[in-house]
Swiss-Prot record:
Organism ancestry: Eukaryota, Metazoa, Chordata, Craniata, Vertebrata
Listed name of the protein: WD repeat domain phosphoinositide-interacting protein 3
Cellular component GO terms, alphabetical: cytosol; lysosome; phagophore assembly site; phagophore assembly site membrane
Record remark: domains: The L/FRRG motif is required for recruitment to PtdIns3P.
Keywords in alphabetical order: Autophagy, Lipid-binding, Lysosome, Repeat, WD repeat
Length: 344
């Protein structure tokens, strides 16, 4: 969740994002960065830079390396540089410079992936990074890109050169033709891979439909309806076994869908009437909850299989529990920016 150029809540938060298994989340601030355990909520690291802001923080599971990009009113680093921070040494150990602004960074143990506004560059994760690949994309100001963290699967997915298309490449075998998925007619707003790299979920700027595809064949597996009105999708995430997905939007709601068992999702009683528009046969979320503040948020599943977390731009943290019937209740509320190690 990128809150640049300005977070309307005035709390100094510029960026929030989960690590690869959603066990932690990192925040870029106007004065440094912070790392939290996601569930249970606990501040793990607070690095203050009195002289500058961090607009992007990318973790690598729970290891000591983080990718930082400067941002905010007084960026700590130039926004066209990726800095790899070693949290044991408390300093940057790798620096990669580009001719244009960095939109996002993705990490796996052997690769650094840097997203620019119309291309993606892949480097070795070594002390002197070596450029391996360059992939063209359509104009990609949001820096959309997902990298499978699984050691047995090196898939990288990003917007293709055609509007609404997703391209999937295997970094372990770039001779293999990429999988090209015409996911949506409109511009992509969000993409997400499951941990195993077998499924990809997509949404367009219209934000009414979420589509799930098989990454090896590109075949559509499920089409899910978030709502009938257009929405800006902030986040999509799978749970650990890819049986569920959660979706957050600017309508202040987080929806939970069954990704593997479509019978769990709600459907109109008119769904079987062949003469009615496709809308009536849509599969709707089986559970949803409202984020009380309505603030932009990212979402992921918690440590319990029936828990969903929401990390919000106003500094609020919510944990909701849902049951088989789809009923939802709030379990935890906290203000994560106001936490310190002493309070926990």
């Amino acid at each position: 969740m990128n809150l640049l150029p300005a977070n309307p809540h005035g709390n100094g938060l510029l960026y929030a994002g989960f690590n690869q298994d959603h066990g932690c989340f990192a925040c870029g601030m106007e004065n440094g960065f912070r790392v939290y355990n996601a569930d249970p909520l606990k501040e793990k690291e607070k690095q203050e830079f009195p002289e500058g802001g961090v607009g992007h923080v990318e973790m690598l599971f729970r290891c000591n390396y983080l990718a930082l990009v400067g941002g905010g009113k007084k960026p700590k680093y130039p926004p066209n540089k990726v800095m790899i921070w070693d949290d044991l040494k408390k300093k940057t150990v790798i620096e990669i410079e580009f001719s244009t602004e960095v939109k996002a960074v993705k990490l796996r143990r052997d690769r650094i992936v840097v997203v620019l506004d119309s291309m993606i560059k892949v480097f070795t994760f070594t002390h002197n990074p070596h450029q391996l690949h360059v992939f063209e994309t359509c104009y990609n100001p949001k820096g959309l890109c997902v990298l499978c963290p699984n050691s047995n699967n090196s898939l990288l997915a990003f917007p293709g050169t055609h509007t609404g298309h997703v391209q999937i490449v295997d970094l372990a075998n770039t001779e293999k033709p990429p999988v090209d998925i015409p996911a949506h007619e409109g511009i992509l707003s969000c993409i997400a891979l499951n941990l195993q790299g077998t499924r990809i979920a997509t949404a367009s700027e219209k934000g009414t439909l979420i589509r799930i595809f098989d990454t090896s064949s590109g075949h559509l597996i499920q089409e899910l309806r978030r709502g009938s009105q257009a929405a800006n999708i902030y986040c999509i995430n799978f749970n650990q076994d890819a049986s569920l997905i959660c979706v957050s939007s600017d309508h202040g709601t987080v929806h939970i869908f069954a990704a593997e068992d479509p019978k769990r999702n709600k459907q109109s009683s008119l769904a079987s009437a062949s003469f009615l528009p496709k809308y009536f046969s849509s599969k709707w979320s089986f559970s949803k909850f409202q984020v009380p503040s309505g603030s932009p948020c990212i979402c992921a599943f918690g440590t319990e299989p029936n828990a969903v977390l929401a990390i919000c731009a106003d500094g609020s943290y919510y944990k909701f529990l849902f049951n088989q019937k789809g009923e939802c209740s709030r379990d935890v509320y906290a203000q994560f920016l106001e936490m310190t190690d002493d309070k926990l």
